Amino acid sequence: GATGLGILPIFGTITSEVGIGFSAVVNTNINFTIPGPASGTTINPLNNSITIDTTGVYSVSFSIVFVIQAISSSILNLTINDSIQFAIETRVGGDSGIRATSARTDLLSLNQGDVLRVRIREATGDIIYSNASLVVIKVD
């Protein structure tokens, strides 16, 4: 995009508290409870979301740490306006005692008013998550 005087960067981040674990429950959104720095986006920890204020191409990243208590697995998907983006997912699984980070970054064309969240689409066994983050940066 354009740079120079008068061009403000557009970005936003929302995270969860470090070390606070949440149970992975099917068809719920990841709990993002701490608003981070933002400019040109709306951060809402009450509904675990980032809203896009300016149409454009964005780098969208999410990262979540899972702690597997028993043989378990989980699938996460980005949602846009509560619509699951099946092509944008991460998977994690394994035996008891495994800690795994589930993360990805995508470039997406987003519209003003789009609301982004991360949803737990599948979860089996005993699995908890923590240290979650969702970050958007407008690149064009």
Regions found by a protein language model. Give the residues of each.
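Extracellular jelly-roll beta-sandwich "head" domains, especially the C-terminal globular C1q domain
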Residues: 2-140
